Design a protein with these regions (language model features):
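Alpha/propeptide regions of enzymes that mature by internal proteolysis
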Residues: 2-4, 11-18, 33-387
């Protein structure tokens, strides 16, 4: 009972600090690419072209990375090379805490990464999960596809395979993510330093954030403690010839139980490609997507003639049905779907129109002219009730 009271106190007393909580998918700041911070207002929120090839799309936090993938597509490169190269920009960026280097750790303070790839032309797939100390797990999933007759490798075995294939082991935790984890431990434990409702909380945080640079992180730290991010980057592309590939890469749910695996590495859930039809991917609460095999559901709806946006909305309806459309329960999480088809058409839908702070859901599209943000459709045309 004491622990629940602490959390309720934390959520209510720090509500004004939560503006950063969903910035990756909704917010003003979209962090990606070469350590730079790209603000969403720098990207025109106008409808990108439909029916154009080549085309590459991703979640909003990939908007700065799509140029890299489009360069490959315009040179006639393989679609899987394009999407993996694009997400590696984000995996390499320590400022993006949703994937790769700098991703927020599990409850033990270890960064665990998941990823999957699907190659439409050869109808192959590769996947890795619960990988530690390897930064570019999308490329690792591609290596599993290319160098083994398996589809998925997990845990220490995946790390050993990566090292054998020449991947560099490294500490994936940055100072920023370490401080956030220490603060989370303090706010979530009975005995491991003062709780948020303790008189010693401010003193403890002052000692932890002992420089102006660290103190500037406090609003963000409080936000990610209250709303553990589920950030991810799915990316999919169609070539001029109509070939399709996709990848999804993530550091998963922040503060998760060690070994937890979400939907990102699950073929048919977080990533699905059929070269005859199209591709779909997701971000948000992976457990909900796994239960409906969302990626596969969307591709099959597209095969039956449903529009991309309607297919994404149908997947969200199936998620909502699992909760009898109870908005109070559904309001405790977010879920987003992204899709493109063989003709170069694209679409996306989110469970909620916006966060409770009013930020609307977007996704990133590059149609060969420039990368831009497009607005997601929404199952529920209102703000999330997420607390």
């Amino acid at each position: 009972m004491e622990r629940w009271s602490r959390r309720k106190f934390f959520l209510t007393s720090l509500a004004s600090s939560f503006a950063a909580g969903a910035s990756k998918l909704f917010g003003k700041e979209v962090q990606a690419g070469n350590g730079s911070n790209a603000r969403a207002e720098n990207f025109a929120l106008t409808p990108p072209a439909q029916g154009v090839r080549p085309l590459i799309i991703s979640s909003a936090n990939g908007v700065n990375a799509l140029d890299r993938g489009m360069e490959i597509l315009k040179k006639g490169g393989d679609t899987l090379d394009a999407v993996v190269a694009a997400v590696m920009v984000v995996e390499d960026d320590p400022n993006d805490t949703s994937v790769g280097y700098g991703g927020l750790p599990n409850e033990d303070g270890e960064v665990e990464l998941d990823a999957s790839v699907m190659h439409g032309p050869t109808r192959r797939a590769g996947s890795v999960a619960s990988v530690r100390r390897i930064k570019n797990v999308a490329r690792l999933a591609k290596t599993v596809m290319e160098r083994t007759n398996h589809v998925m490798l997990v845990g220490p075995g995946a790390t050993r395979f990566a090292v054998a294939e020449g991947f560099e082991e490294m500490n994936l935790r940055t100072e920023k993510s370490r401080l956030a984890w220490l603060a989370w431990k303090a706010s979530s434990s009975f005995n491991w330093r003062p709780g948020i409702d303790s008189p010693e909380w401010k003193e403890h945080m002052a000692a932890l954030l002992d420089t102006p640079e660290r103190q500037a992180l406090l609003p963000w730290i409080e936000s990610v403690i209250a709303h553990p991010p589920t950030g991810t980057i799915p990316c999919m592309a169609v070539s001029e010839k109509g070939d399709i590939s996709a990848t999804t890469t993530t550091s998963g749910l922040a503060w998760k139980i060690a070994g937890r695996v979400g939907d990102s590495p699950i073929i048919g859930a977080g990533c699905c490609v059929d070269n005859d039809v199209g591709a779909a991917g997701s971000t948000g609460k992976g457990e909900e997507n796994i239960k409906i095999s969302g990626g596969h559901t969307i591709v099959e709806m597209m095969r039956k003639g449903m529009s991309l946006t309607d297919a994404c909305l149908e997947a969200l309806r199936r998620v909502a049905r699992n909760y009898n459309n109870d908005k109070k329960k559904l309001g405790t999480f977010h879920l987003f779907y992204y899709a493109l088809n063989k003709n170069g058409e694209h679409g996306s839908a989110s469970l909620w129109r916006s966060t409770r702070n009013g930020r609307r859901a977007n996704y990133a599209v590059h149609d060969g002219t420039k990368a831009r943000l497009a607005e997601c459709a929404a199952l529920f045309d209102e703000a999330s009730g997420d607390e």
